[in-house]
Amino acid sequence: MTMLLEEIVQSVELWLKLIKKPQPYVDPNLDPVLLVPGIAGSIMNAVDDENGTEERVWVRILGADYKFRTKLWSRFDPSTGKTVSLDPKARIVVPEGRYGLEAIDALDPDMVIGQECVYYFHDMIVEFTKWGFQEGKTLFGFGYDFRQSNRLQETLDRLAEKLEAVYNAAGGKKINIITHSMGGLLVKCFMCLHTDVFEKYVKNWIAIAAPFQGAPGYITSTFLNGMSFVDGWEQNFFISKWSMHQLLIECPSVYELMACLDFHWEHIPLLEMWRQRLDGDGNSQIILESYPLAESVEIFKEALSSNTVNYNGEDLPLPFNMEILKWANETRKIISRAKVPPQVKFYNIYGINLETPHSVCYGNEEIPVTDLRQLRYFQPNYVCVDGDGTVPAESAKADGLNAAARVGVPGEHRGILCEHHVFRILKCWLKADHDPFYNPLNDYVILPTAFEMEKHKDKGVEVTSLKEEWEIISQDQDHDHDDKVAADERPMVSSISVSDVGAEACATVTVHPQNEGKQHVELNALSVSVDA
């Protein structure tokens, strides 16, 4: 019955054109939010330093794999800690449009059909604007070159500048940072290395699906047979699996996502292989060999010892990079020392209830691994644990920080960014017109005991009445003529009715003549329902 009355009210509002062109809702009391993506989550453009032309190289449809190989393939420079594009003329930049949101919204803005497959923060941005956040005032984004180390000074300097800019744009309000995936490692590095800046500008940090202790299963398979860290995105991004592998093998960020050696795993992540060996009597036998984290590095080295990439007709060696591993190990030491400043609150949301790769096994008893350099052609088999399908929950919730709250949410690694459960939690923590009775730790809403609604019910018949009024203010500045014309007019009366099985609602709408630029509208509605 209430629904029938709502339909009547909406019909009248549409008729009066009160909601034909709604103005975006803006809440001036909200604190600013900065969204920080994870690996592969930023649009990247290549600038030709010779002629100044700029083109998108991640993500694109036409010529995607070719541009990816010619512009994004890179080599690590241990003297600077930076990975540099093989093309000496190409300079990789991240677009700053829409206050940084352009780079992290839809990763291919030109894709019209099926664009949702390359959405990143899109759904969250749409949801936030409904809550009253405004781009450039209280909503911002920070895209970055995800190939680089999470402690690259160039990236950290950009983040410091961004925080200051957001702080100033919001009128001196402190910032809520929301990170996804590897973005959590970037912010944790920044918090450790630039504690004073972090404390000055940040109010809350909310990490979502962050691989704080690594993503063992996916990173192992990334090194050995080219599976992308973000499972399933390759086919959407039109990049071959091996082209992605040849990029990631020189990316410090990927090495920084390896499983942490000093973390006390419930089950140690293993690299396992079925191998053909000779016993003491010289007889051949097939055995399962297991390598813990430290020992698996030797397997990576041997498996990638002959790996090359052909660039401009020249074969360049691309082995497992021990220099990057050293750099990544130092990054992990820095991250482990991070502490949340006393005035900042930290929250952690992590994905659960999905099979998530943890240990990886190659070969089987019928087809053992005979040559490690052929591992790229083997299909990995995973031993899975609970998580978001990419990051184990054990890793994501082990942030090592003083957290105000940690909440596990059923969801997939990327899809968790559009989960309404997550939106409810964020709305509460951001104080965006949140329900004071909502508890994000158990996702329950406790309703107040008092509930006021006028009803009359007798012998199975329920009657509900409704009265609503509007006042329309004309945009026309010349009201005198209209007032004279309307002086002798009578109010216009119309009726509306809506019916359903066992229920009926009717209403009378009275539109009074305009007076001094204002027009008064009254709605009186009555609904009657009969118990079935």
Give the predicted meaning of each segment.
Residues 1-299, 311, 355, 377-383, ...:
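N-terminal non-catalytic accessory region
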Residues 12-18, 325-332:
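Short linear interaction motifs
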Residues 298, 304-305:
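Extended, loop-rich substrate-binding clefts of extracytoplasmic carbohydrate-active enzymes
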